[in-house]
Amino acid sequence: MTRALAGVLVAIALLAGCGGNSVTQPAGSTKVTMTEFKFDPSDITVPHGKVVFFLVNSGNTQHDLAIRDSSNNRLSVSELVSSGDSVVFTVDKIDAGTYTIYCTQQGHEASGMKGKLTVT
């Protein structure tokens, strides 16, 4: 009986280690849900300065969030977020203006995975 209990405990420990990279949403962050092939919300307004995004991948493939200015320069990009995972993406300083957000994965932006970031 002890041996069976030990086996069950080992199995539980192994399954617990299989969890995703999900984290809790920080206070004051902007939640963005990513799916194929869109951001929700796709039109985001935040104050200038430090901006914290809470990215949740509800899709079936990896996604990220990149920020591009009006001159087509990439300002920042999050890490890749696996399906079912969430991450905190911090941009230390962003000036007031209008930016494009998009997914850098091949074909995602062209499929509509983009939006607008307005910084006030």
Identify the function of each model-found stretch.
Residues 1-8:
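Bacterial N-terminal signal peptides that target proteins for export
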Residues 14-17:
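C-terminal motif of bacterial Sec signal peptides marking the signal peptidase cleavage site
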Residues 19-21, 82-120:
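Extracellular/periplasmic metallocenter environments
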Residues 25-48:
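N-terminal edge beta-strand
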Residues 36, 45, 57-59, 69-71, ...:
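A mature extracytoplasmic/lumenal domain signature
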Residues 42-61, 87-95, 99-100:
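Beta-strand cores of secreted/periplasmic/IMS beta-sandwich domains, seen most often
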Residues 64-68:
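Beta-strand signatures of extracellular beta-sandwich domains
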Residues 72-78:
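Surface-exposed loop/edge segments in extracytoplasmic proteins
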